[in-house]
Amino acid sequence: TWLRPGENRISFIEENGFHVVFGQRCCNKKGEDVCGDTFSFTNFGRKRAVMLLSDGMGTGKKANEDSRRLIETLEDLLEAGISEEFALEMIQDALLFQDKGAFSTIDAAVISLKTGILKLLKAGGMATFIRHKNSVERIMPAALPPGCRIGQQFDLKYKKLYDGDMVIMVSDGMLEFENMPEISFRMESLIGKIKTN
Protein backbone atom coordinates (compact mmCIF):
# COMPACT_ATOMS: atom_id res chain seq x y z
CA THR A 1 0.00 0.00 0.00
CA TRP A 2 1.05 3.58 -0.66
CA LEU A 3 1.25 6.11 2.15
CA ARG A 4 -0.31 9.52 1.65
CA PRO A 5 1.65 12.64 2.60
CA GLY A 6 1.77 13.01 6.37
CA GLU A 7 1.02 9.34 7.02
CA ASN A 8 3.45 7.01 8.76
CA ARG A 9 3.62 3.25 8.99
CA ILE A 10 4.68 1.61 12.24
CA SER A 11 5.61 -2.07 12.45
CA PHE A 12 5.67 -3.96 15.75
CA ILE A 13 7.93 -7.00 16.03
CA GLU A 14 7.78 -9.22 19.09
CA GLU A 15 11.14 -9.45 20.82
CA ASN A 16 12.56 -12.92 21.30
CA GLY A 17 12.66 -14.22 24.84
CA PHE A 18 16.09 -15.74 24.27
CA HIS A 19 19.35 -14.86 22.58
CA VAL A 20 22.04 -17.42 21.84
CA VAL A 21 25.79 -16.86 21.92
CA PHE A 22 27.90 -19.47 20.10
CA GLY A 23 31.45 -20.57 20.78
CA GLN A 24 33.66 -23.42 19.56
CA ARG A 25 37.02 -25.09 20.01
CA CYS A 26 38.56 -27.90 17.97
CA CYS A 27 41.95 -29.44 17.33
CA ASN A 28 43.38 -32.01 14.96
CA LYS A 29 44.38 -35.49 16.00
CA LYS A 30 48.13 -35.79 16.40
CA GLY A 31 49.72 -36.36 12.99
CA GLU A 32 46.69 -35.12 11.02
CA ASP A 33 46.49 -31.86 9.04
CA VAL A 34 42.75 -31.39 9.52
CA CYS A 35 40.12 -32.30 12.08
CA GLY A 36 37.61 -34.99 11.13
CA ASP A 37 34.78 -33.08 12.82
CA THR A 38 32.58 -30.42 11.22
CA PHE A 39 30.28 -28.00 13.04
CA SER A 40 28.06 -25.05 12.24
CA PHE A 41 25.98 -22.44 14.04
CA THR A 42 23.04 -20.81 12.31
CA ASN A 43 20.14 -18.53 13.21
CA PHE A 44 17.12 -19.34 11.08
CA GLY A 45 15.27 -16.05 11.02
CA ARG A 46 13.99 -14.89 14.39
CA LYS A 47 12.56 -18.24 15.39
CA ARG A 48 15.33 -20.69 16.16
CA ALA A 49 19.05 -21.20 16.52
CA VAL A 50 20.60 -24.42 15.24
CA MET A 51 23.90 -26.02 16.25
CA LEU A 52 25.18 -28.93 14.18
CA LEU A 53 28.09 -31.26 14.89
CA SER A 54 29.26 -34.22 12.81
CA ASP A 55 32.15 -36.58 13.46
CA GLY A 56 33.39 -38.34 10.34
CA MET A 57 34.43 -41.97 10.57
CA GLY A 58 38.17 -42.25 11.08
CA THR A 59 40.43 -39.20 11.18
CA GLY A 60 41.96 -36.57 8.95
CA LYS A 61 40.97 -35.39 5.50
CA LYS A 62 38.56 -38.21 4.55
CA ALA A 63 36.67 -37.93 7.83
CA ASN A 64 36.52 -34.16 7.41
CA GLU A 65 35.15 -34.45 3.86
CA ASP A 66 32.45 -36.89 4.96
CA SER A 67 31.33 -34.86 7.98
CA ARG A 68 31.48 -31.54 6.08
CA ARG A 69 29.36 -32.93 3.23
CA LEU A 70 26.80 -34.19 5.72
CA ILE A 71 26.58 -30.87 7.58
CA GLU A 72 26.31 -28.86 4.35
CA THR A 73 23.52 -31.13 3.10
CA LEU A 74 21.66 -30.82 6.38
CA GLU A 75 22.02 -27.03 6.33
CA ASP A 76 20.64 -26.87 2.78
CA LEU A 77 17.61 -28.95 3.77
CA LEU A 78 16.89 -26.83 6.83
CA GLU A 79 17.25 -23.59 4.85
CA ALA A 80 14.71 -24.99 2.39
CA GLY A 81 12.20 -25.18 5.24
CA ILE A 82 12.36 -28.93 5.85
CA SER A 83 11.97 -30.03 9.47
CA GLU A 84 14.99 -31.37 11.33
CA GLU A 85 13.41 -34.80 11.72
CA PHE A 86 12.53 -35.19 8.05
CA ALA A 87 15.93 -33.82 6.99
CA LEU A 88 17.68 -36.51 9.05
CA GLU A 89 15.43 -39.18 7.58
CA MET A 90 16.32 -38.00 4.06
CA ILE A 91 20.03 -38.11 4.86
CA GLN A 92 19.59 -41.56 6.39
CA ASP A 93 17.96 -42.87 3.22
CA ALA A 94 20.58 -41.24 0.99
CA LEU A 95 23.45 -42.81 2.94
CA LEU A 96 21.80 -46.22 2.85
CA PHE A 97 21.42 -45.90 -0.92
CA GLN A 98 25.11 -45.00 -1.32
CA ASP A 99 26.16 -47.90 0.93
CA LYS A 100 29.80 -46.80 1.10
CA GLY A 101 30.29 -48.27 4.56
CA ALA A 102 31.43 -44.95 6.06
CA PHE A 103 29.23 -43.33 8.66
CA SER A 104 29.35 -39.86 10.17
CA THR A 105 27.55 -38.99 13.38
CA ILE A 106 25.07 -36.13 13.65
CA ASP A 107 24.23 -33.98 16.65
CA ALA A 108 21.62 -31.28 16.10
CA ALA A 109 20.60 -28.86 18.84
CA VAL A 110 17.66 -26.64 17.89
CA ILE A 111 16.76 -23.84 20.31
CA SER A 112 13.47 -21.96 20.10
CA LEU A 113 14.25 -18.28 20.59
CA LYS A 114 10.66 -17.72 21.70
CA THR A 115 10.24 -20.43 24.35
CA GLY A 116 13.76 -21.61 25.18
CA ILE A 117 12.82 -25.19 24.35
CA LEU A 118 15.81 -27.25 23.18
CA LYS A 119 15.15 -29.97 20.62
CA LEU A 120 18.07 -32.38 20.58
CA LEU A 121 18.47 -34.90 17.75
CA LYS A 122 21.32 -37.38 18.01
CA ALA A 123 22.39 -40.07 15.55
CA GLY A 124 25.52 -41.77 16.81
CA GLY A 125 26.94 -38.69 18.51
CA MET A 126 28.50 -38.54 21.96
CA ALA A 127 26.96 -37.14 25.14
CA THR A 128 25.60 -33.60 25.18
CA PHE A 129 25.76 -31.60 28.39
CA ILE A 130 23.43 -28.86 29.62
CA ARG A 131 24.93 -26.56 32.23
CA HIS A 132 22.10 -25.21 34.39
CA LYS A 133 22.59 -22.70 37.17
CA ASN A 134 23.03 -25.32 39.89
CA SER A 135 23.45 -28.60 38.03
CA VAL A 136 24.79 -30.36 34.94
CA GLU A 137 22.56 -32.60 32.84
CA ARG A 138 24.08 -35.28 30.63
CA ILE A 139 22.16 -36.56 27.61
CA MET A 140 23.43 -39.85 26.22
CA PRO A 141 22.74 -41.12 22.68
CA ALA A 142 21.21 -44.47 21.81
CA ALA A 143 20.76 -44.33 18.03
CA LEU A 144 23.46 -45.41 15.60
CA PRO A 145 25.03 -43.08 12.98
CA PRO A 146 23.06 -42.33 9.79
CA GLY A 147 23.33 -45.18 7.32
CA CYS A 148 23.01 -47.91 9.97
CA ARG A 149 19.34 -48.84 9.87
CA ILE A 150 19.32 -50.92 13.01
CA GLY A 151 16.70 -49.85 15.52
CA GLN A 152 16.06 -46.16 15.97
CA GLN A 153 17.22 -43.77 13.27
CA PHE A 154 17.90 -40.97 15.74
CA ASP A 155 17.22 -39.96 19.33
CA LEU A 156 14.84 -37.07 19.88
CA LYS A 157 14.65 -35.29 23.21
CA TYR A 158 13.19 -31.99 24.39
CA LYS A 159 14.63 -29.94 27.25
CA LYS A 160 13.71 -26.56 28.73
CA LEU A 161 16.51 -24.01 28.84
CA TYR A 162 16.66 -21.05 31.20
CA ASP A 163 18.57 -17.78 31.26
CA GLY A 164 22.30 -18.47 31.54
CA ASP A 165 22.12 -22.17 30.58
CA MET A 166 24.84 -23.62 28.36
CA VAL A 167 24.50 -26.43 25.81
CA ILE A 168 27.83 -28.21 25.32
CA MET A 169 28.22 -30.62 22.41
CA VAL A 170 31.34 -32.77 22.09
CA SER A 171 32.71 -35.40 19.72
CA ASP A 172 34.43 -38.68 20.58
CA GLY A 173 37.79 -36.96 20.78
CA MET A 174 36.66 -35.69 24.19
CA LEU A 175 34.95 -38.76 25.57
CA GLU A 176 35.97 -41.92 23.70
CA PHE A 177 38.33 -43.62 26.12
CA GLU A 178 38.52 -47.07 27.69
CA ASN A 179 36.79 -45.86 30.85
CA MET A 180 33.94 -43.91 29.29
CA PRO A 181 31.81 -43.51 32.49
CA GLU A 182 34.74 -42.06 34.44
CA ILE A 183 35.71 -39.64 31.66
CA SER A 184 32.09 -38.57 31.25
CA PHE A 185 31.82 -37.99 35.01
CA ARG A 186 34.98 -35.88 34.96
CA MET A 187 33.56 -33.88 32.08
CA GLU A 188 30.40 -33.23 34.08
CA SER A 189 32.48 -32.14 37.05
CA LEU A 190 34.54 -29.77 34.89
CA ILE A 191 31.45 -28.27 33.26
CA GLY A 192 29.90 -27.83 36.70
CA LYS A 193 32.71 -25.44 37.60
CA ILE A 194 31.84 -23.10 34.73
CA LYS A 195 30.18 -19.94 36.00
CA THR A 196 26.85 -18.96 34.48
CA ASN A 197 24.82 -15.75 34.77
Say what each PLM segment does.
Residues 32-46, 106, 139-182:
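Acidic loop->beta-strand submotif enriched in PP2C/PPM serine/threonine phosphatases
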Residues 4-56, 62, 69:
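N-terminal entry segment of metal-dependent catalytic domains or homologous docking segments
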Residues 14, 122, 170-171:
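Flexible glycine-/small-residue-rich
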Residues 14-38, 92-96, 126-158:
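PP2C/PPM family metal-dependent serine/threonine protein phosphatase catalytic domain
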